[in-house]
A protein has these predicted regions:
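Generic transmembrane alpha-helix signature in multi-pass membrane proteins
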Residues: 22-30, 95-101, 112-113, 120-139
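Structural signature of hydrophobic alpha-helical transmembrane segments
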Residues: 6-20, 73-87, 150-163
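Ordered, amphipathic secondary-structure segments that act as subunit-interaction surfaces
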Residues: 61-109
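Juxtamembrane transmembrane-helix termini in multi-pass membrane transport proteins
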Residues: 6-47
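Hydrophobic core segments of alpha-helical transmembrane domains in multi-pass membrane transport
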Residues: 23-27, 45-51, 84-93, 118-125, ...
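Cytoplasmic-side transmembrane-helix entry/capping segments in multi-pass membrane proteins
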Residues: 37-47, 78-83, 105-116, 182-188
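C-terminal ends of transmembrane helices
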Residues: 23-37, 91-105, 167-178
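Interfacial loop-to-transmembrane junctions
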Residues: 172-190
Length: 208
C-alpha cells in the first residue's frame, strides 16, 4: 500500500507530466483558456490514462517481453504500434461518450478531444511504465503489477488535470489584467507556465 501511495503522489507532484517532462503541451496550451474546458479535457486525459496503462502493462509483460509467449522470442519492437493502437481505441470510446452525454463540451474541445490519441503525455506514460517495469523492487518508481500501473496512471492524470486547470484559472484572471502588448497571448502564457514549473520544482527533492 505504501508503494502505491508513493507512486500516486510522485506522479502528481514530483514526476508531473507537464511541469517535469513538458508532455502534452499542445492541448495544454490550446484548451487552457477557460476552466470548464480544461476540467473536461483533464478528466478525459485521466480516464484514458487509467484505462490504457493497465492494458499496455499486460501487453508488455504477457506479450511483448522477451520469452513471454515463446522462449527466445522478444516482441518489444512492436510496443510503439500496440501502445498507440490501444490508446487510439480508448480515445475513440471517450469521444463517443463525451459526444453522447455532453455535446456542449464536445463542441468546445473540438479537434483536441480526438487528438488525445496523439497526446505525448499518454504515450509518454506508457513508455515510462515500460521502463519502470525493469527497475528493482527497492526503487520507488518500480511498477510491478496492475495495481501499480493504475496508481501511476491515476496520479499522472490528476497531475495533468491540476496543471491545466491551474493554468486555465490564471489565464481567466489575466484576461482582465493589463498585460503589455508584446506579451499578450502565448507570450505571457509561456511565462506563466515557466513560473508554475519552477514552483513544482520544490517537490523534486521529495524522497517518497
Amino acid at each position: 500500500m505504501e508503494h502505491l501511495i508513493s507512486l500516486f503522489v510522485r506522479s502528481i507532484f514530483v514526476d508531473n507530466m507537464i511541469f517535469a517532462f513538458f508532455l502534452g503541451m499542445c492541448s495544454y496550451l490550446a484548451v487552457s483558456k477557460n476552466v470548464k474546458n480544461a476540467v473536461g479535457l483533464g478528466i478525459a486525459v485521466t480516464f484514458v490514462l487509467v484505462v490504457t496503462l493497465p492494458v499496455n502493462y499486460l501487453l508488455q509483460t504477457k506479450v511483448l517481453a522477451a520469452n513471454a509467449i515463446i522462449e527466445g522470442v522478444d516482441l518489444s519492437f512492436l510496443s510503439f504500434i500496440l501502445f498507440i493502437a490501444v490508446i487510439a481505441a480508448i480515445v475513440q470510446l471517450v469521444e463517443m461518450i463525451v459526444e453522447r452525454f455532453s455535446p456542449s463540451l464536445y463542441a468546445s474541445l473540438g479537434i483536441f478531444l480526438p487528438l488525445i490519441a496523439v497526446n505525448c503525455a499518454i504515450m509518454g506514460a506508457s513508455l515510462f511504465m515500460q521502463q519502470r517495469i525493469t527497475l528493482g523492487e527497492s526503487d520507488p518508481k518500480f511498477i510491478g503489477g496492475i495495481a501499480d500501473a493504475v496508481s501511476y496512471a491515476l496520479g499522472s492524470g490528476i497531475g495533468w488535470l491540476l496543471a491545466i486547470v491551474g493554468l486555465a484559472a490564471i489565464r481567466e484572471k489575466m484576461a482582465y489584467s493589463d498585460v503589455p502588448a508584446p506579451l499578450k497571448g502565448l507570450g505571457i502564457t509561456f511565462i506563466t507556465v515557466g513560473l508554475m514549473a519552477m514552483a513544482f520544482m520544490c517537490f523534486s527533492g521529495l524522497n517518497i
